[in-house]
Amino acid sequence: MLWARGRQPDHRIRMSQQTTIRKLAELVNTPVDKLLVQLAEAGMKFSGPDQVVTSTEKMKLLGFLRRTHGKADTPAEAASEAAKKITLNRRKLQEVTVNAGRTKTTVNVEVRQKRTYVKSENEGSGRAAPMTPDEERADILAKLAASRQRNLDEQQRLAESDRARDEAIQRKRDEEQAAKDRVEAERKAAEEAAAAASAPAPVAAAPAPSSAPAARAPSSPSSAPRPARPAGASPASRPATPARPDDRNNAAKHKTRGSHVMVAGVEDDDATKRFAGQLHLSAADRARRSNVRGKPTGRPGSSSSRRNDGGRGSNQSNSGPHGFERPTAPVVREVAIGETITVADLAQKLALKGGDVVKALFKMGVMATITQSIDHDTAALVTEELGHKAVRADNADFEDALLAHAEDAQGETTSRPPVVTIMGHVDHGKTSLLDYIRRTKIASGEAGGITQHIGAYHVETGRGVISFLDTPGHAAFTSMRARGAKITDIVVLVVAADDGVMPQTKEAVAHAKAAGVPLIVAVNKIDKAGADPLRVKNELLAENVVAEDFGGDTQFIEVSAKVGTGVDTLLDAISLQAEVLELKAVADGRASGTVIESSLDKGRGPVATVLVQQGALKRGDYLVCGIQYGRVRALFDETGHQPASAGPSIPVQVLGLSGVPEAGDDFVVVDDERLAKDVAQQRETKRRESRLVASATNRMEDILAQMGKGEGQQVLNLVIKADVQGSVEALKQSLVALSNDDIRINVIHSGVGGITESDANSAAASKATIIGFNVRADASARKIVESNGIDLRYFSIIYDVIDQVKQVASGLLGVEIREEIIGIAQVRDVFRSSKFGAVAGCMIIEGVVKRSKPIRVLRDSVVVFEGELESLRRFKENVDEVRNGTECGIGVKAYNDVKAGDQIECFERIEVARTL
């Protein structure tokens, strides 16, 4: 019931003080039985529909219905109900590593939690009477004691937790120390056992140690032997006896690989010194390091023999752990790859030759030279194919600096006006509705009466400032509508009451849901005779847009843009929705926002229509907008005035950029022009590299496609110039979408502004058609167009562009040859003729058989011959054609195998023009 929910209060005004139940049911458009049931549920019993309902009883019924639908009786109660609830939204970002083939990929996971706290009714209803000062003091002391006790309990719990943790750590350390001691004891036992097993028996008793160390004699085969080492010099020292020279020679001669360096039972002093004190070595390692590798060469007693016997040079031939070892597994490198990389740079990072990388690319089906750039995905695939690991390089240094500037601009947030986008099907009255709100005539100024740009306006109403974005409704402007939905706060969907839901209406609903913005439906043209608002509500149910009348949450407002009916109600609904959203923004500091539309003005240069989302945009600010930059020379609002600054949710036109930015680019204000220029140049470089990679890939795909087809596709080249960037984007998407397997629409160049000499030269070189959308060619361009015979066409409505390009493309397709059967003859008997051979006596069972048309002979529904007629006779006369139900004689040229029961099929070939 609409009046019960406060949407049409005029019903209550029209009701008299005493009304019967029947009359009340007629006023609120509710069955009498249902109204009686609702009155009974509200606690009022009536015997019949003719009883009188007083104002008190009506208010009681109204309060009951409000409570039933979850509404408060008064605004004060509604405010109190809202104050009892608080909703907390929490977002948590996590990174999860998942396996993706040979590598692991990190995926960002966002966890959203929503929790609503409701204040209990008992807290307000069960509140005790005011306490006396003594009672308040006792209550405070009790709470203080309870708080102290809780703090003591918490401290005790934390102390016990710390004590348990320390005990666990100490226990773990003791276990580790015990394990180390056990391993050390086992190692010492193994060393002692190995030393006892390898120690030889003493040859003779050692002489008494002298107080001074004996001088070492020179080591030579003819010299005297060295005296034995004192007993306390080394724990491994053993008594030794002088050895004869021939014994040394024999020891050097019979020494083998891995044997002890021993001369007549005396251990080599150099080996003992070299490894003395290395207690960390096991017995086996000590023995291995003490061995002398290699075989002796030369005569016994020579210098080479002495080196091999364990002299000073013996350490060079030992194979210690620091010697070179050939790697047993390939080296896996971690290669950082940006958005694009040349094949030569990738080969250098992989430590491979450039030819090897080119071969790997060829095996993967990518034909590239060593100087060509490849994209990140291709480089990562070839890196994985060569056995290395690819990681994405972070080369956004200037982007990080830009983000840091944007974060510095954050300050105190204040309320901002809502940004409302008007969306809907073409000719449903979007611009007319906005025109009535603004009290201007914008719709009549658009070509064809349809909107082809995004119009941005802000309107000051009695309920505050509201910024409106008027989007086109034509199917070609899909990207414009999607861009408008992304930067908006509220979407007003305009639906004509006589037309209902149309394709672009459904698309607008999808854009609004994808952007996650609330929707308000304005049912327009209710003043027309065939208006049916209920039909609109039912059709939008299929798109999951449920009206409040049907139990949903979407507001439906019936308006008329022509006479202004319901416009104030629509503005109220927008203001109410904006209050619910609680829109906030930083009003001061560096500005940032989005480009809505851009164009090239002949007198003012590049002009960008931007929507400020944060901060304040002022004249003189340095701006970075996509790949363009510059200093703000002037600001203009929709009325042509120059405001001093533009705050959040205010659309303005900006002059002073270096070029025309693309619609949808984000802009941000920076400190100086140098940073702005560096960021813009880096973005331009990245975009150019990506474009080169994409063009190389497209060229290769075109070559492969031409190889796979015999004749290849017909190509229609176009040069598109328009007045604004949004129109260029819409034209490109709409015209390229006309391509199919037989013809391809190729846009070789597009841009904003008039048609220049370079545009004409490009069209002449590629034999392209020039399309000017709301722009004209200058004198030099017209001269080139006339001299080269270039097809130049001007348009102002996008419908005409699409239709004429379809006609031109259809002309390139040529004609298609089709065969159409015109008659069938049944062979009843076969006669022999001396002149024609076999002559078929036939009955025409369908259509007409003509002498000049080709025929086919079918036997058991299978074609056995295709040729032409040699003779067609009716009785004995030659005739040109024989119609259905007539007997005739047919002579088939160069075919004498006609049999009874065959069918002769007569057909003709016709040419049909091909269309897209």
Swiss-Prot record:
Region described as G1: 424-431
UniProt: GTP binding residues: 424-431, 470-474, 524-527
GO terms for MF: GTP binding; GTPase activity; guanosine tetraphosphate binding; translation initiation factor activity
Keyword Protein biosynthesis: yes
Keyword Nuclease: no
Pfam families: EF-G_D2, GTP_EFTU, GTP_EFTU_D2, IF-2, IF2_assoc, IF2_N
Start-end of Basic and acidic residues biased regions: 151-191
Record localization: Cytoplasm
Region called G3, residue ranges: 470-473
Keywords tagged on the record: Cytoplasm, GTP-binding, Initiation factor, Nucleotide-binding, Protein biosynthesis
GO biological process, one term: translational initiation
UniProt domain tr-type G: residue ranges: 415-584
Subcellular location, principal: cytoplasm
Region (G4): 524-527
An example Gene Ontology CC term for this record: cytoplasm
SUPFAM superfamilies: Initiation factor IF2/eIF5b, domain 3 (SSF52156), P-loop containing nucleoside triphosphate hydrolases (SSF52540), Putative DNA-binding domain (SSF46955), Translation proteins (SSF50447)
Summary of the function given for this chain in its UniProt record: One of the essential components for the initiation of protein synthesis. Protects formylmethionyl-tRNA from spontaneous hydrolysis and promotes its binding to the 30S ribosomal subunits. Also involved in the hydrolysis of GTP during the formation of the 70S ribosomal complex.
NCBIfam families reported in the protein's UniProt record: IF-2 (TIGR00487), small_GTP (TIGR00231)
Family: Belongs to the TRAFAC class translation factor GTPase superfamily. Classic translation factor GTPase family. IF-2 subfamily.
Name of the molecule in the record: Translation initiation factor IF-2
Organism of derivation: Xanthomonas campestris pv. campestris (strain ATCC 33913 / DSM 3586 / NCPPB 528 / LMG 568 / P 25)
